[in-house]
Amino acid sequence: MNELVDTTEMYLRTIYDLEEEGVTPLRARIAERLDQSGPTVSQTVSRMERDGLLRVAGDRHLELTEKGRALAIAVMRKHRLAERLLVDVIGLPWEEVHAEACRWEHVMSEDVERRLVKVLNNPTTSPFGNPIPGLVELGVGPEPGADDANLVRLTELPAGSPVAVVVRQLTEHVQGDIDLITRLKDAGVVPNARVTVETTPGGGVTIVIPGHENVTLPHEMAHAVKVEKV
């Protein structure tokens, strides 16, 4: 796989990540997420716009075209199927899974994807609770259910009294922070875990699990965790 294709797919998936998190996709956000300079990002975005993969809207946010979204979905599908394989079969430590899946997402064929779906018993979510998109396009299974309607971000919980919730999704941005994802795992903050959360004065959130050390998330990371109220 050549470097140009890898870069294009990485940008598409990052825009998809931002959309999932409810963060406006701007070139500045891509620069932050991928640790690239502003000029480099602008040059790549311009090339992708010429290639018909995205549009730069009037307010400067990035919009995926139909062609770009289809490719972004395919890349994310490969990424999350790879995560399932790495966790469920290979047993790779949680903190290493995201970075490894970022490599696999660029080289996996659709034939391998279909075989993985069978081997993994038709998964619809990643080990981190995120829906695997584009399964219908692959012709192997249904889209994930519309359970997202019941989910809220930690930053959307009311301030004040502690709130009991069930952890449902840890987004790609959270997974990319190795120290944070390790602390969350060690504290038992994983999908389907019941925890208590309290909003901190600075807009962050403290997660409390009996028998474990509390974990405090800054606003940016708390926004990237979805939960369901108990």
Swiss-Prot record:
Keywords linked to the UniProt accession: Activator, Cytoplasm, DNA-binding, Iron, Repressor, Transcription, Transcription regulation
GO CC annotation terms, alphabetical: cytoplasm; peptidoglycan-based cell wall; plasma membrane
Domain HTH dtxR-type residue range list: 4-65
Pfam families, per the entry: DtxR (PF18357), Fe_dep_repr_C (PF02742), Fe_dep_repress (PF01325)
BP GO annotations: catechol-containing siderophore biosynthetic process; negative regulation of DNA-templated transcription; regulation of DNA-templated transcription; response to oxidative stress
Cell compartment(s), UniProt: Cytoplasm
A molecular-function term among this protein's GO annotations: nickel cation binding
Function: Metal-dependent DNA-binding protein that controls transcription of many genes involved in iron metabolism. Acts as a repressor of siderophore biosynthesis and as a positive modulator of iron storage. Also regulates expression of transporters, proteins involved in siderophore synthesis, iron storage and transcriptional regulators.
PANTHER family: IRON (METAL) DEPENDENT REPRESSOR, DTXR FAMILY (PTHR33238), IRON-DEPENDENT REPRESSOR IDER (PTHR33238:SF10)
Subunit structure: Homodimer.
Family: Belongs to the DtxR/MntR family.
Protein name (database record): Iron-dependent repressor IdeR
Organism: Mycobacterium tuberculosis (strain ATCC 25618 / H37Rv)
Gene this chain is encoded by: ideR
